Curated annotation (Swiss-Prot):
Note in the entry: Present with 623 molecules/cell in log phase SD medium.
Official protein name in the record: Uncharacterized protein YNL184C
Residue span of region Disordered: 74-108
Domain of life: Eukaryota
Sequence ranges of Polar residues compositional bias: 84-95
Amino acid sequence: MKRVTLIVLPRRQFPFLKFHSKEALESAVNLQLIRRKKSVNIQIDSVTFCIYFCLLYFRTLEYHRGTISLHNVTGSKKRDSKANSRSRPSGTITSRGARIGLQGYKSH
């Protein structure tokens, strides 16, 4: 059974949509999905300016320097773990340990 994910993106978060028509956005996303051999169903609500993506195996959509990239569930999990390790780098733990070690030497 294929997992279908519905993504709602507010248009204000993606300023490039002001310069793209619905057809241009669909062609750009479909071009990405053709490379990945996936299909996507895109609907843009003209009233609320939200995009509705009905994606198979895709959770997040990123727009960076004119390129739309889609990340699947496993890829996004890997990216999240990398982001978590960046937010808590091991360098701070080691430097803190070094400070504690210096304090220990000073007390003795």
